Regions:
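An anion-binding loop in the catalytic cleft
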Residues: 214-311
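One-carbon transfer enzymes
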Residues: 1-232, 277-280, 286, 305-311
Length: 311
């Protein structure tokens, strides 16, 4: 079974951990397909994707097509018996999906059929869900619609962000692929149809990054902010400038303040009045500045915002 020729598709850290599990389990990874490397940081230095970096470390050939459908022949030249994908980032064309004798499998970070699509982890946190999970599923021509072979439930704590939840899901996904893949390949583990009662987890739109203090209560705002950590990061606008929110907590308490009012700084946090409570911002990034803690911000220009109102 582990002599099967496997091609792995993936890009970010989450996918990197799944690839690492396959390598540790001695599967024969003949090639890896990842998104093109991109410039990062202020110096815009080209950096390899996490999956690219891991594949290089193990001497595995890497393909990084900008448009996969135009380079399908290069992928199929590796004659895969099985394809495994996780957070790749492009639609895989039918000519590739139909090629492997053992099919194409995907590790998806939600409890399908809930949250098909590109941002299932973000949406679970933003919606205040108490649990999510990972599924090992068959890839079909419709997005995230294939039969589910196995799943694992993961609890979402109140303090979890998308960043911390991804770490939990990475571990669950690695455990799942180790336990379930042999049964899928030898035919002893059968898939279950998802049915038609599904929900979508659309990608985060730029306009969703802005927090609306006037329209949402403290619980919605808190979930919104932690759902966008560590990317793309939620922000508020005050005095015409953006402030990004990196670490927050909340306190539920009825009050008569105008939502979005900066009440001052206490316990190392910027305190903002919201409907049904207060938001405490511990780490932030003022427009044009570096990320800092709220205490440092207060000692600079921050305290002058007391009494001002976020849009």
């Amino acid at each position: 079974m582990k002599d099967l020729r496997v091609i792995f598709f993936g890009t970010p850290r989450f996918a990197c951990e799944i690839l690492k599990a396959l390598i540790e389990e001695k599967y024969h990874i003949v090639a890896v397909v990842s998104q093109p490397d991109k410039p990062v940081g202020r110096k815009r230095k080209i950096m390899p994707t996490p999956v690219h970096e891991l594949a290089d470390a193990h001497g595995i050939p890497v393909l990084q097509p900008a448009k996969l459908r135009l380079q399908a022949d290069e992928v199929l030249a590796y004659q895969p018996d099985l394809i495994v994908t996780c957070a790749y980032g492009q639609m895989i064309p039918d000519v590739i999906l139909d090629a492997p004798a053992y099919g194409c499998l995907n590790i998806h970070p939600s409890l399908l059929p809930k949250y098909r699509g590109g941002a299932p982890v973000h949406r679970a946190v933003m919606n205040g869900d108490e649990e999510t999970g990972v599924c090992l599923m068959e890839m079909v021509h419709a997005m995230d619609a294939g039969d589910v072979f196995a799943r694992r439930i993961v609890k979402i704590d109140e303090e979890d962000t998308t960043e911390t939840l991804n770490l939990k899901l990475e571990k669950a996904g690695c455990d799942l692929i180790r336990e379930a893949l042999p049964g899928v390949v030898d035919g002893t583990l059968k898939g279950e149809p998802q049915g038609e009662n599904y929900t979508l987890a659309r990608n985060i739109a730029p306009e969703e990054e802005k927090v609306s203090f006037a329209a949402e209560d403290v619980n919605v705002i808190y979930n919104h902010i932690r759902g966008l950590i560590d990317w793309p990061i939620a922000y508020g606008v005050i005095e015409g400038k953006r402030i990004k929110f990196y670490a927050v907590r909340r306190k539920t308490e009825e009050n008569d303040h105008v939502p979005g009012t900066v009440m001052g700084f206490e316990d190392g946090c910027m305190k903002i009045a919201c409907m049904k409570g207060y938001l405490y911002v511990k780490e932030l990034q003022p427009e044009g500045k570096s990320r800092m803690d709220a205490k440092a911000f207060a000692n600079g220009a921050g305290r002058a915002l007391t009494g001002k109102v976020f849009e």
